[in-house]
Amino acid sequence: MEQFQIVNFYEFKQLVDVTPLPEVKERLKELMIETGVRGTIILAEEGYNASLCGTSDEMSAFLLAAAKILDTEFDPKVSLHNERPLRKIDVKIKPEIVTLKQPVDISLGAGTHVKPEQWNEIISDEETFVLDTRNDYEFKNGTFRGAVNPETEKFSDLPAYIAENLDPAKHKRVAMFCTGGIRCEKFAPYMKGLGFDEIYQLEGGILRYIETVPKEDSLWDGECFVFDERRTLTHDLVQGIEPDHSLRNPKRYNR
């Protein structure tokens, strides 16, 4: 039985410097139809964010052509599944590729990227505030040992939590993580703008960690919620047990 690749990738770059967004949208949608790839691509002036699936041949053809359209080189995260967990063709233009609803100076740069192999050392330090930037229903399916749950319903709630609970003078070292890295890539410069200087973020997100770090060495407890029909993943990116649906937003998947 042929397996399907689930491929996620994103990049913060000025897409309007490449091609007008409506044209990019149409070209990518046509490419999805042509190659048979399914999933969602979000476009904004600040960049792109994609979650796609297809056979190995379909994905190879799509990524080769899409890289030319977007004038980039992809660094995708890839996992496998026996069925297509994504079934629609959807290319959207939005104000943001991940919705924070706050001004962010991306030029401040991301935090220090920590490879999965070094992540345990960072979050085991008592001086480190370990921040799960995901939502409450994601946290309850699984998180890193010692991580703090901001109890947010959506990503745009996180700035209010920071304003009420963190102080740059007291919380000098913050290590943050999310599913695949995109939320941290945006939130790290936001926190730098607030005066937090020592920011660390998990390179490749939880997905790369549970793919890379052996279970016996892992500080990850539970399963990782994902935004497709698989629902959750465990170590080695294996589909987890169907979660309690009360742990997620019943109306929509907020990121």
Predicted regions mapped to residue ranges:
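A conserved helix-loop-strand patch within extracytoplasmic ligand-binding domains
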Residues: 111-115, 123
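Rhodanese-like catalytic fold shared by cysteine-dependent sulfurtransferases
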Residues: 2-111, 128, 134-174, 182-255
